């Protein structure tokens, strides 16, 4: 903010004509004698903390007013003091806040309207302190000191909860849950600073890599990686549609001049992409909340529609992570977020849906063969009131998965939710990759004016936020980290067969086997199995090694014996170790049947690469 302060005999103004950004007001003229005239330009950087900027401006105005022994203040918007102005909405808010705070402190304040062409007269007193300029930096608001969250391990059977701390944390016997608890309590291990293995894998396996011509944390996806990402998106789509969700699509950018959009965005702090276009300040979304909430606001919602679920694959979502925090697919600035929001009539319905969606989130771990660790987070009031409900869920979870859960209790609500569950995969370095989540939002319906029309009148509903898998990139991250853990145990690392870009590689021993090998690969493709045929001029042993490096689940070697017997020699990666491949003899039909059984109920897409390996291009 820039300010010009003039100690004046008087200031008189009259608003003559509106501009496009004029505020609506009836105060079109005014005069104040013996005043401090404050000409103010609100700047773009003030948008990060409008309240703090207003407080900083008031403190500076007050200092000068006290020096001059002045009680009359004119707040006069004056854009000509800066070439880097804030949005009109922010400027009006800051100017009104300055007026309001000054009045609260006992000053007589006249504020000229924003966005009008105005005529004004001023008489400067002409003494050494009569003309002063100031640059205002936002005053940091003092954070409320309060009780911190507490973390507990609980025994669902006895309903005993044990508060966790650095001294007793090793009572947790499950290594993955222990790693999650250490992370939550801020207990860091030395190996956490190492680079996770998936960072190497994503490049080695031709999945994706950083795009140097873009902002850090943005990836380019190669055909194999794009295929994997699309398959995961198809998987989530099928899951949520079966849950009763209606897919929608909304914009990726939003106008921060909308008060509800700004307030919701500000809940997430500074880690956002914001930019200006003309007089508008816009932001790139970090989730699908904004568009879905605006859509729900315009719907005429009736109780019989509820619970109402809208789903969007938020491609792309943006989060401006600090550069030093960017780590492969775990922390990036552009990601793909499956995002479902459920409108619930009341808290009772919301809790029922929360429970159902929690189990659907856990199902994704079963389907993806990922080991999940669970932490529930509740405000103290909510937990105290619904303790029995929570322990019922925890007990059912323990009975099904044999695992305990961690519980975080917040002394009071500081977010839009009163309860949530976060589900994490633990990477090979013992760090959590938080993926699925369900949250009970008690705030956003009112903020966005989302209403349900009942016989008794309009009510604000409860909204659940749910991402059944977490971001697609983090799912891949978790799968690759799991593969690294398997490799540490001596097992052959691999991805699920349905998600593997190449499911079968056919390798001919000699040129005379090429035609037969090609027919095998073609028949596999005809049966919706992603197969290719290695016709490169390399030794058979090197071709087999290459297939191993690419984690191909099934490798078929075709020689004279295979052609004569119609029995294929198949290396099955799932049963192999790093030192010893596992091989079986089977017919082509048996191989097809085996793969179809393994991939049943999972989405399929064809391999977007030539069937001949010699024609498949290299991307780096």
Curated annotation (Swiss-Prot):
Q: Where is this region: Catalytic?
A: 197-496
In the record, the effect of residue 134 to A is given as: Still charges Thr, 20% editing of mischarged L-seryl-tRNA(Thr)
Q: Which parts of the sequence are annotated with region: Editing domain?
A: 1-141
Q: How is the cofactor bound?
A: Binds 1 zinc ion per subunit.
Record text on activity regulation: Not inhibited by 1 uM borrelidin (BN); probably does not bind BN.
What is catalyzed by this enzyme? tRNA(Thr) + L-threonine + ATP = L-threonyl-tRNA(Thr) + AMP + diphosphate + H(+)
Q: Which InterPro entries match?
A: aa-tRNA-synt_IIb (IPR002314), aa-tRNA-synth_II (IPR006195), aa-tRNA-synth_II/BPL/LPL (IPR045864), Anticodon-bd (IPR004154), Anticodon-bd_dom_sf (IPR036621), DTD-like_sf (IPR023509), Thr-tRNA-ligase_IIa (IPR002320), Threonyl-tRNA_syn_edit_dom_arc (IPR015011)
Q: What is the effect of changing residue 46 to A?
A: Wild-type for Thr charging and L-seryl-tRNA(Thr) editing
Q: Which GO terms describe its molecular function?
A: aminoacyl-tRNA deacylase activity; ATP binding; threonine-tRNA ligase activity; tRNA binding; zinc ion binding
> Outcome of mutating residue 118 to A, per the record?
Still charges Thr, no longer edits mischarged L-seryl-tRNA(Thr)
Q: Which family does it belong to?
A: Belongs to the class-II aminoacyl-tRNA synthetase family.
Quote the subunit structure annotation.
Homodimer.
Free-text note regarding domains: The N-terminal domain (about residues 1-140) is an archaea-specific tRNA-editing domain that has a highly similar structure to Dtd (D-aminoacyl-tRNA deacylase). Editing of incorrectly charged L-seryl-tRNA(Thr) by this domain is tRNA catalyzed.
Q: What is this protein called?
A: Threonine--tRNA ligase
Source organism (scientific name): Methanocaldococcus jannaschii (strain ATCC 43067 / DSM 2661 / JAL-1 / JCM 10045 / NBRC 100440)
């Amino acid at each position: 903010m820039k300010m010009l302060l003039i100690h004046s005999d008087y200031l008189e103004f009259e608003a003559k004509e509106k501009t496009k950004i004029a505020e609506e007001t009836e105060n079109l003229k005014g005069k104040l004698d013996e005043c401090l005239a404050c000409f103010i330009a609100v700047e773009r950087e003030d948008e990060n903390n409008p309240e703090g900027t207003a407080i900083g401006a008031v403190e500076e105005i007050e200092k000068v007013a006290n020096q001059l022994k002045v009680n009359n203040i004119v707040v006069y918007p004056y854009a000509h003091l800066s070439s880097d102005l804030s949005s009109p909405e922010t400027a009006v808010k800051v100017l009104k806040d300055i007026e309001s705070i000054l009045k609260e402190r006992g000053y007589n304040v006249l504020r000229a309207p924003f966005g009008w062409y105005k005529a004004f007269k001023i008489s400067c007193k002409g003494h050494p302190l009569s003309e002063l300029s100031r640059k205002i930096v936002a005053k940091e608001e003092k954070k409320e000191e309060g009780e911190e969250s507490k973390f507990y391990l609980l025994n669902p059977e006895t309903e005993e909860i044990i508060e966790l701390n650095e001294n007793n944390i090793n009572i947790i016997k499950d290594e993955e849950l222990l790693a999650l608890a250490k992370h939550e309590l801020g207990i860091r291990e030395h190996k956490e600073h190492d680079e996770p293995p998936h960072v190497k894998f994503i490049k080695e396996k031709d999945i994706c890599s950083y795009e140097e011509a873009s902002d850090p944390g943005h990836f380019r996806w190669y055909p194999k990686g794009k295929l994997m990402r699309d398959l995961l998106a198809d998987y989530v789509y099928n899951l949520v549609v079966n849950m009763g969700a209606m897919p929608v699509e909304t914009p990726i950018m939003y106008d921060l001049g909308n008060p509800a959009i700004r307030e919701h965005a500000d809940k997430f702090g500074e880690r956002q992409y914001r930019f200006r276009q003309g007089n508008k300040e816009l932001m790139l979304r970090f989730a699908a909340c904004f568009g879905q909430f605006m859509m729900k606001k315009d719907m005429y919602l009736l109780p019989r529609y509820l619970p109402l679920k809208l789903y969007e694959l938020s491609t792309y979502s943006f989060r401006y992570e600090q550069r030093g925090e960017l780590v492969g697919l775990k922390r990036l600035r552009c990601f793909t977020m499956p995002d479902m929001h459920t409108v619930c009539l009341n808290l009772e319905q919301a809790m029922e849906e929360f429970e159902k969606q929690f189990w659907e989130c856990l199902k994704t771990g079963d389907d993806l063969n990922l080991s999940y660790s669970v932490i529930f987070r509740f405000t103290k009031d909510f937990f105290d009131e619904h303790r029995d409900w929570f322990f019922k869920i925890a007990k059912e979870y323990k009975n099904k998965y044999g695992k305990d859960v961690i519980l975080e209790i917040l002394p009071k609500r500081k977010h839009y939710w009163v309860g949530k569950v976060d589900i994490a995969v633990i990477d090979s370095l013992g760090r959590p990759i938080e993926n699925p989540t369900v949250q009970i939002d008690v705030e956003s319906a009112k903020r966005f004016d989302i209403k349900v029309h009942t016989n008794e009148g309009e009510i604000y509903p409860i909204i659940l936020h749910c991402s059944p898998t977490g971001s697609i990139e983090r799912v891949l991250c978790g799968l690759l980290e799991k593969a690294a853990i398997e490799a540490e145990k001596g097992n052959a690392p691999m991805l699920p067969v349905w998600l593997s870009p190449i499911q079968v590689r056919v390798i001919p021993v000699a040129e005379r086997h090429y035609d037969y090998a090609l027919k095998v690969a073609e028949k596999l493709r005809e049966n919706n199995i992603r197969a290719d045929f290695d016709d490169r001029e390399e030794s058979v042993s090197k071709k087999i090694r290459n297939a191993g490096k690419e984690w191909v689940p099934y490798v078929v070697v075709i020689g004279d014996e295979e052609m004569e017997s119609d029995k294929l020699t198949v290396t099955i990666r799932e049963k192999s170790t790093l030192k010893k491949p596992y091989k079986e003899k089977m017919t082509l039909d048996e191989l097809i049947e085996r793969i179809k059984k393994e991939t049943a109920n999972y989405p399929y897409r064809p391999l977007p690469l030539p069937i001949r390996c010699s024609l498949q291009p290299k991307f780096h």
